[in-house]
Design a protein with these regions (language model features):
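A short, hydrophobic beta-strand element within the central beta-sheet of small alpha/beta folds
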Residues: 80-90
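Conserved acidic segment of CheY-like receiver
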Residues: 4-25
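Short hydrophobic/Thr-rich beta-strand motif most characteristic of the beta2 strand and flanking loop
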Residues: 30-39
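C-terminal output helix
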Residues: 111-119
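Conserved phosphotransfer microenvironments
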Residues: 53-73
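Walker A (P-loop) phosphate-binding motif
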Residues: 130-146
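Acidic, metal-coordinating helix/loop segments flanking the phosphotransfer/catalytic sites
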Residues: 38-53
Length: 146
């Protein structure tokens, strides 16, 4: 247990978003933020080479090329690192695709850094926590009779 530092890789071309995210994670001693200031479609192995605990991808979820690039990344990672997607696009088709790709979470801009940090921490905790947040459906049947 000498080194408990988790690396989070941020892929974004939005300089303001990158700076805000760096500032948000700077206070944490257990999380190291590594940034790649490229478009998701321009990545050529940066994520594969980086040993990361989670990946934050800032992308346009309505852009088919970027969705295909995200699909390649999810296949490359093979579930070893959760992916958190940050997008400005929020429509049913984009949500359906992100759910099918099994991203850990997706957030819509504008967002607060607190939401992003919370989402990343939840993603780093892994799937073992999902059982605690699973929804439960209760059905109440009224008594019928006379």
């Amino acid at each position: 247990m000498a080194n408990q530092t988790k690396r989070i890789l941020l892929v974004s071309t939005d300089r303001a978003f990158v700076q805000e995210t760096r500032t948000a994670f700077a206070a944490s001693e257990s999380i190291q933020l590594v940034t790649v200031e490229k478009n998701i479609t321009d990545l050529r192995g940066e994520i594969q080479e980086t040993d990361c605990g989670a990946v934050i991808v800032d992308m346009d979820a309505a852009n088919l090329d970027q969705i295909e690039a995200l699909q390649r990344i999810t296949r490359r990672l093979e579930g070893r690192a959760p992916i958190v997607v940050v997008t400005q696009e929020f429509n049913a088709a984009a949500v359906r695709i992100l759910v099918q790709l099994q991203v850990a979470d997706f957030l819509v801009k504008p967002l607060t850094t607190a939401d992003l940090v919370r989402s990343c921490i939840r993603a780093l905790q892994g799937p073992g926590r999902e059982e605690n947040t699973e929804s439960h459906i209760y059905t109440f049947i009224p008594s019928a009779g006379g």
